[in-house]
Amino acid sequence: MNKIVFISLLAGVSLFSADYSSVISSPNASKLIQKDLLAPATKYTMPAGCITKDPNAIARGAFIFHNLNGKKAKKKPPKGLSRKQMKPGVTYHQGDKIPAKQYGNCIACHNIEGAHGAGNIGPDLSNYKKTYIDSGARNYQFVFQKIADPRIDNPKTNMTVNLTTKLFTTKEICEIASYIVSPK
């Protein structure tokens, strides 16, 4: 009997439920979607002098690799990096809030020497120079391209697209690449 009463109640509710389709708006999201689409994969040429042994550049690359930034960031960025980044084309006035610069947080997916809490989604980058560069399996251009826009040889990659989206500058990508291939 309980089953019959329950089924009767369900049937009654479904017969008298309100039709809300006329009050729910359905905006055309095409423009929003187009704005969020990534530009096509872009092939980049590494600039001359990109890979460096300069300890300051390597320190900046390491900071970008190991940190995300934001309000909870604890470490102070090395000389030449800022916690804030002005957006191109935006005029700032005294007292305006300048947005935080987002760093790579590459460590969330990759392991590398000295990493704490490294991820395992992306390849392990430990001993990269010895394993890949010195052996001839990869070159510096490959490292630069993988950081700039990894979709060139892997269209379905989960890695962030950094130069094409302007998340990083060419200089920052060179510094990250210099850190990855540097002795640790």
What are these regions (language model features)?
Residues 81-144:
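Gly/Gly-Pro-rich "capping" loops immediately C-terminal to redox-active cysteine motifs
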Residues 63-73, 100-112, 124-127, 141-148, ...:
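C-type cytochrome heme c attachment motif
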Residues 39, 47, 135, 150-151:
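Short secondary-structure boundary micro-motifs
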